[in-house]
């Protein structure tokens, strides 16, 4: 019979004890930790059978005692453990509890005994502590006054230590150490960084002391005392620096010793706070260097270098430019060396400026001092240099040598002015010598001009430039070559007053001489204006050719060109008149120009049909024989270009005159019945025959350019030859100078 599991059990089964136990056993859970630990302990109490005891007779069960910390275990036979455990579990557990309690009681009894002993010791220690406290109370009452006194003394000691610390700080801030005092005052300690550090410390003390001076009366008095003491220390330090500088400055007697150490530079920088001491030290330096430089200059003039090299400068006194140039070069080199030495000593911060380069901006204090000292150092050179150069200038008679010396002086004057300034004594001396040299040069140039005008004679038959003009032009060429080597900026040469004065004094007398000679030629030969113009054009052209070599003579060239144009126009007019006479049209043109306004040309004698026919016939014959390129009358002109130009312009005027005659003849108002038959040649035909047709200006420009190019090539060839000669001469002279210097 099947039963439904979901059918509830009958109520009687719930009261059955067996059912209850079964349900209880089934519903009990042993998953909690305490239950599992209890089961593990119980299972440990009843271990399995020992394998070693196998085969031996064992009692039903045996109680085995292990150490105190383990529970007793029962050895059970196979299959009996569960039964024995159920039988003896409660008994075994109670036995274990009893055994454990006994052990606890024994342990606590021993602890109680030890605690009793400890209590006795504590009571004894309490008695001893009470005795000590009693004695301490007695001692405190007996030493109370001493403790109070000790507290007072301790407070006084702390106050004294604080004051001592403050005094130490005050002294360290407002006084110098022994080493610093020694550096300031002792002569045995040399000048160096310790002295400068001590001076800085003194200055700092004086700066800090200003706070004391503005405080209470006592502090102000302390400040005054400190200021007085530090003032003495400062003066002692500056005096020591002053003595050091004076001693060192006296050692600068030779060029090889010119080297300023960093200590020297800093010493001079410190002395700037004492201008009087610095001025006195610098006076020692300037007197020493001035004497040394002067002796070196005199030795260079008379003795030369060590072992005779370089050779003495005065050995070249026979060569003025070499002599003056060597002296000025020595002065310039010495100036550069001295300038570099002084700038290094005074600590001038150089702004990448080369020696001889112009200074820019305002001078600083260091640069101003260096310039002043340099001026005084070189002051001794002024007199011997001036005397020797003046004697050299006075002894010169040649104008070129005088100008070379003057130009050389100008070169070094510009260089020295840029190096040491225009206010320096040496520069002023050079300026004075330079002015005197130019005065002597201009006097010589004036004397040459007067010499040109003193002995005049008429030009020769060739009308070429006279020999005196050629000599003067050669001198002018060399003068301009010397000027071209000067330091004057090429952009400023055109406006240079010295150049304008030179050209005026050199060219003016030459032009005046040529004009006077031309007048003498006109009066002597009776050649009139023609020969005068040819001579003037040749002479002025020669001068113009001399000046064309240089691009800074534009104004003078323009003046000469205007004069040449005037004479060319005069020659063109006269040449045209001569050609007009030779071709037979002169009378006809005079009649056309001077006839009455109301009278036809055919009724006048010179322009009557018969006379005009004869004149035109002569013109036709002349035109077939005339040379359109040149004329024998212009053969004396040295410029082929001008000869062609004058001849072509004259022929052009002949062509224009013939054209005007043609217009008059063909004009019915003039009264010519057969005018066309009278004109044997047309106007264009005449223009072609004379080479001056409608396109003659273009052809003339082309020919003129060709002639100019040819003349320019010839002139360039000649100029290059002349320049080559002058350059070779200068190179030879420079080579000789270099060899002598070497």
From Swiss-Prot:
Residues 720-742 have a biased composition (Basic and acidic residues). The lineage of its organism: Eukaryota, Fungi, Dikarya, Basidiomycota, Agaricomycotina. One of its GO terms (biological process) is intra-Golgi vesicle-mediated transport. The keyword Transmembrane helix does not apply. It is found in: Golgi apparatus membrane. Belongs to the COG6 family. It is a peripheral membrane protein. Acts as a component of the peripheral membrane COG complex that is involved in intra-Golgi protein trafficking. COG is located at the cis-Golgi, and regulates tethering of retrograde intra-Golgi vesicles and possibly a number of other membrane trafficking events. GO terms for cellular component: Golgi membrane; Golgi transport complex. It holds the Pfam family COG6_C. Residues 694-703 have a biased composition (Acidic residues). This is Conserved oligomeric Golgi complex subunit 6. InterPro entries: COG6, COG6_C, COG6_N. Keywords: Golgi apparatus, Membrane, Protein transport, Transport. Residues 692-742 are annotated as: Disordered. SMART domains: COG6. It comes from Cryptococcus neoformans var. neoformans serotype D (strain B-3501A).
């Amino acid at each position: 019979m099947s039963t439904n599991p979901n059918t509830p059990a009958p109520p009687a089964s719930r009261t059955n004890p067996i059912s209850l136990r079964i349900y209880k056993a089934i519903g009990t859970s042993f998953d909690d930790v305490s239950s599992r630990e209890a089961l593990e302990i119980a299972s440990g109490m009843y271990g399995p059978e020992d394998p070693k005891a196998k085969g031996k007779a064992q009692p039903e069960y045996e109680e085995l005692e292990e150490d105190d910390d383990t529970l007793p275990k029962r050895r059970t036979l196979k299959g009996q453990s569960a039964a024995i455990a159920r039988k003896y579990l409660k008994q075994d557990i109670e036995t274990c509890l009893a055994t454990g309690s006994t052990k606890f009681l024994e342990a606590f009894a021993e602890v109680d005994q030890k605690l009793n002993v400890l209590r006795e010791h504590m009571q004894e220690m309490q008695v001893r502590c009470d005795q000590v406290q009693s004695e301490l109370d007695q001692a405190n009452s007996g030493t109370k006054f001493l403790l109070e006194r000790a507290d007072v003394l301790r407070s006084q000691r702390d106050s004294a230590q604080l004051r001592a610390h403050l005094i130490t700080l005050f002294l360290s801030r407002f006084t110098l150490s022994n080493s610093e005092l020694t550096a300031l005052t002792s002569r045995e300690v040399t000048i160096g960084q310790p002295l400068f550090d001590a001076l800085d410390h003194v200055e700092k003390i004086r700066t800090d002391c200003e706070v004391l001076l503005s405080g209470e009366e006592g502090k102000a008095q302390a400040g005054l005392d400190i200021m007085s003491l530090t003032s003495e220390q400062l003066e002692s330090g500056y005096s020591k620096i002053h003595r050091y500088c004076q001693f060192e400055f006296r050692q600068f007697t030779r060029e090889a010793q010119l080297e300023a150490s960093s200590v020297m530079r800093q010493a001079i920088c410190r002395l700037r706070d004492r201008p009087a001491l610095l001025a006195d030290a610098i006076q020692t330096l300037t007197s020493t260097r001035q004497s040394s430089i002067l002796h070196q200059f005199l030795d260079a003039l008379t003795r030369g270098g060590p072992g005779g090299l370089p050779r003495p400068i005065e050995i070249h006194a026979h060569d003025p430019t070499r002599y003056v140039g060597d002296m000025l070069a020595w002065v310039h080199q010495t100036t550069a060396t001295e300038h570099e030495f002084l700038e290094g000593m005074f600590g001038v911060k150089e702004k990448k400026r080369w020696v001889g380069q112009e200074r820019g901006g305002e001078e600083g204090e260091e640069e101003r001092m260096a310039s002043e000292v340099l001026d005084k150092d070189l002051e001794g050179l002024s007199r011997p240099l001036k005397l020797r150069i003046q004697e050299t200038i006075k002894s010169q008679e040649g104008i070129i040598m005088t100008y070379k010396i003057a130009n050389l002086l100008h070169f070094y004057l510009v260089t020295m002015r840029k190096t040491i300034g225009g206010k320096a004594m040496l520069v002023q001396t050079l300026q004075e010598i330079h002015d005197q040299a130019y005065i002597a040069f201009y006097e010589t140039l004036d004397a040459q001009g007067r010499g040109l005008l003193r002995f005049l004679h008429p030009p020769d038959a060739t009308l070429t430039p006279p020999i005196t003009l050629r000599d003067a032009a050669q001198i002018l060429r060399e003068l301009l070559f010397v000027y071209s080597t000067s330091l004057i900026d090429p952009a400023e040469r055109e406006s240079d007053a010295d150049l304008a004065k030179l050209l005026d004094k050199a060219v003016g007398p030459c032009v005046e001489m040529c004009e006077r000679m031309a007048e003498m030629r006109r009066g002597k030969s009776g050649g009139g204006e023609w020969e005068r113009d040819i001579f003037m054009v040749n002479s002025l052209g020669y001068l113009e050719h001399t000046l064309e070599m240089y691009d800074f003579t534009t104004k003078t060239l323009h003046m000469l060109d205007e004069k040449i144009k005037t004479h060319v126009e005069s020659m063109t007019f006269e040449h045209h008149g001569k050609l007009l006479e030779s071709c037979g049209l002169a009378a006809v043109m005079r009649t056309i120009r001077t006839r009455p306004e109301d009278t036809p040309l055919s009724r006048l004698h010179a322009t009557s049909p018969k006379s005009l026919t004869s004149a035109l016939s002569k013109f036709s014959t002349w035109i077939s024989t005339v040379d359109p390129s040149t004329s024998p009358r212009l053969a004396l002109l040295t410029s082929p270009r001008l000869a062609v130009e004058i001849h072509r312009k004259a022929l052009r005027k002949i062509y224009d005159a013939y054209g005007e005659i043609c217009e008059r003849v063909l004009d019915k108002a003039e009264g010519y019945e057969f005018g066309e038959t009278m004109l044997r040649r047309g106007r264009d035909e005449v223009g072609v025959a004379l080479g001056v047709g409608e396109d003659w200006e273009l052809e003339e420009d082309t020919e003129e350019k060709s002639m100019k190019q040819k003349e320019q090539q010839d002139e360039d060839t000649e100029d290059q030859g002349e320049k080559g000669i002058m350059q070779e001469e200068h190179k030879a002279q420079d080579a000789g100078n270099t060899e002598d210097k070497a």
